[in-house]
Amino acid sequence: MYQLAGRHKKRVHKSVVVAVTALVVGSIGCVATYRFWPTELPKPVVVAKPQARAYAVSAQSNTLFVGDVYTGRSVNVWAQASPLKYAYPFSRLSEFNRGSYNAWIANLECPTVAGLHLTPVQEEATLSFNCDPGYLPELAKWFNVVTLANNHTDNQGVAGFAETQQHLTENGIQYFGHPDPRQVNDLCDVIALPASVRMSDGKTVDGDLPVAMCGYHGFIRLPSPEAIAVMNEYSAYMPVIAMPHAGTEYKAAPDALKTNLYRSMIDNGADMVLGGHPHWVQTTESYKGHLIVYSMGNFIFDQQGSLEVTRSAAINVQFNVQGADAALLAKWLALGKTCGTYHDNCLVQAKAAKLAKLPFAFKFGVVGADDSNRITRPASPAVQAGILQRMNWTETMSQLQAPYFSL
């Protein structure tokens, strides 16, 4: 019995040892598992799909066309007597809310030859103008494009005209037109018109729309039918804006000769005609549903004798492209990047690529200006009302036809 009991005790002891050992090993395993096994299952790897590249869905250029701009003669005297110097003629243009526009376009009414300083008496006696190139950096802060098709840009001869073009290029100002309408190859140019481009992701980016602008000087001699017909080549592909400089000065309405000339521009492909030269605001009309402005008047000038010569009508034109094929719009915007230099080959490129014309719509408004007391600024309500009345604006707007509309 004693021996049996002893063996039994040994077996119990061994069982206890085995159980304790198993418990310890199990505990160590649990600790190891707790320490080395992740507390959470690994998250599945998600491969991000490449985002679709945003593309242009629409484009708009809010542009202001103004009348005659001249910084010579008395304007120069006033400016140089002012602490603002070359900035003086432009010192209140901020009141027009320049930031709300993509572009400003003007008629530059003088050559810019360096070192040629004429007094007001000299300029008045000969009506041969020159403007100091020192004004161009200030002009460039406001204006993107100018027309050179008028009766003064050639006042300093062929060399003076070429120098003017050079100074404009140096200051980043695009230009078009020629003082001699017989220079048929120099009348129209494709301009890179700054625009706001709406993208498919909702963002808005800057872009350029190719637009043809044609300048016609018709004061000395009328442009020939051949010169007017040049616009047809451009109008098959893009919008065409005609900016003629013609007619009798200091009149409230055009004569029959001028009326027929400007209407012929519409007949030959112009979307609109925005005229200058008479120094007064003149009437407007809707011709075949298109807008003709016979004269916008003086925007920056030294004439101060009456309200007629100090008020002017700036024409706000909205160029809208909506509903265009995305691929077609992308091609035109890509082309626009190459249209910022004089006599570029943008029309040739458009023809070679067989680009279809974009579906443009145009909206028009009038922004009155007043340069009495020597500084150009927005017109008062009374002056604005007089401008609209002279232009018979309400009637003209009511007679426009699609794609031309009132703002």
Residue ranges with predicted function:
Residues 65-67, 103-109, 143-151, 176-179, ...:
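Active-site neighborhood of phospho(di)ester-bond hydrolases with catalytic His/Asp-centered motifs
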Residues 72-74, 112-115, 151-165, 182-188, ...:
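Active-site environment of divalent metal-dependent phosphoester hydrolases
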Residues 142-145, 256-315, 321-325:
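Conserved beta-sheet core of the metallophosphoesterase superfamily
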